[in-house]
Amino acid sequence: LMMPAIWILAISSALMYVSRYAVNSWGVFYLETQKGYSTLDASFIISIGSVCGIIGTMFSGVISDKFFSGRRNAPALIFGLMNVMALCLFLLVPGVHFWVDALSMVLFGTAIGVLLCFLSGLMAVDIAPRNASGAALGIVGIASYIGAGIQDIMSGILIGGHKSIVDGKEIYDFSYINIFWIGAALLSVFFALLVWNVKSKD
């Protein structure tokens, strides 16, 4: 537990949880408010991410074992960047473009599903000594949910704090949310890169 790599990985996972729960908690609201979707359509689009997350989780081990000889760092980088790209599609393409937003959720869900296994699980086990693997998983797990909690608070502040009333309608400025969510995903990739060559001391 004194290994800095475990704590760095915990930060990376926490930042990934920021983007995960940002979309899960606020995605429907964002699509309705910023892009003009109906509640039904917005909910359907976000649900695509959940389904693809299951697929990403199911195949994460196969991806690393079959295509990367059991290494987790390269696929963590690839799917971390996929998460960033998905958020950019979701947040930065204005208006109602159903297939673009659906594609963003396919990419997002798949990426998050894989990253959940790698950042929040397998990489911690690979790095930690055998007699401390459970504790390492606990640290990463706690940090991840702290990240999720901070996300809800910060997103609420950023959304509520940049609301204005124009002609009797509530108008939201999501530019700060874009920076927060995409920035968290980018920083998650950065911190994951810092443990690229770290190996267990066993």
Please describe what each predicted stretch is.
Residues 2-60, 116, 120-121, 148-155:
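Extracytoplasmic gate region of multi-pass secondary transporters
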Residues 31-32, 63-68, 154-164:
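Interfacial helix-cap and linker-helix signal at transmembrane-aqueous boundaries
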Residues 65-80:
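Cytoplasmic membrane-interface "Motif A"-like loop-to-helix N-cap segments
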Residues 69, 123-133:
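Paired intracellular helix-loop junctions of major facilitator superfamily
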Residues 71-74, 157-185:
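A membrane-interface helix-boundary motif in multi-pass transporters
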Residues 81-95:
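C-terminal ends and interior cores of transmembrane alpha-helices
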Residues 90-94, 174, 179-202:
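Multi-pass alpha-helical transporter architecture, strongest
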Residues 130-164:
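A late C-terminal transmembrane helix in Major Facilitator Superfamily
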